[in-house]
């Protein structure tokens, strides 16, 4: 299955630094991955496209420039490498949730919230995510 990608290319003034930090934090929150210094990628979905469009508008408000591209990966020595870059941190987060779910003093509400935040960045529907959801529901935290 071919994945279509969105690329956000931007330039933002160095000063004040708060704008640069805001954009970086937002990109991390969205689950975007940096391909180069100011080239970030997300799998294309209606939601991610809207999120990148909003961020591009915010970059413009910060006196920066932003261009949003739609792209297909035509060649790579390892065609699944980019997909794995998205999946690896997500699966680490799911494993941590599953580990915390086994603890006696677990906070199901907090674990459920962590699951929801992780699932929002799980662009490729990880099997571990499904298992985590099922175990949370069985524990009464879903």
Walk through the language-model features, giving the residues of each.
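C-terminal, charge/polar-rich interaction regions
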Residues: 109-142
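Positively charged, polar, low-complexity stretches
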Residues: 1-103, 116, 120, 135-139
